[in-house]
Amino acid sequence: MELTPREKDKLLIFTAALLAERRRARGLKLNYPEAVALITAAIMEGARDGRTVAELMHEGTTVLAREDVMDGVAEMIPEIQVEATFPDGTKLVTVHHPIV
């Protein structure tokens, strides 16, 4: 199977998000890479489902709460930008203050 660099990046994000989901389900607080991966994957999947950029900008702020992440992680992520594939093409989704 041949994958493009972009497809490899998507799989890496998905794998990291899956690990983050499992750790969160076990009651562990997420670190920086896990938090970013989980929010990014939610945005990418929402785009694939056909949601709008505006919907995903809002949804990105509801994926994690401060209680879900280690101390200081929320402050380390002032925004997340995701280049997501929508049914009508690729668009940039920016989520400001994703962890509140």
Swiss-Prot record:
Pathway: Nitrogen metabolism; urea degradation; CO(2) and NH(3) from urea (urease route): step 1/1
Keyword NAD set for record: no
Gene3D superfamilies: Urease, gamma-like subunit
Subcellular location per the Swiss-Prot or TrEMBL entry: Cytoplasm
GO CC term, one of those recorded: cytoplasm
UniProt-listed Enzyme Commission number(s): 3.5.1.5
An example Gene Ontology biological process: urea catabolic process
Reaction(s) catalysed (UniProt annotation): urea + 2 H2O + H(+) = hydrogencarbonate + 2 NH4(+)
Enzyme class: hydrolase
GO function term, MF aspect, one: urease activity
The organism's place on the tree of life at top rank: Bacteria
KW NADP (keyword) present: no
Keywords for this protein: Cytoplasm, Hydrolase
Family (UniProt): Belongs to the urease gamma subunit family.
PANTHER family recorded: UREASE
HAMAP family (alphabetical): Urease_gamma
Subunit structure: Heterotrimer of UreA (gamma), UreB (beta) and UreC (alpha) subunits. Three heterotrimers associate to form the active enzyme.
Record-given protein name: Urease subunit gamma
Originating species: Cupriavidus metallidurans (strain ATCC 43123 / DSM 2839 / NBRC 102507 / CH34) (Ralstonia metallidurans)
Name of encoding gene: ureA
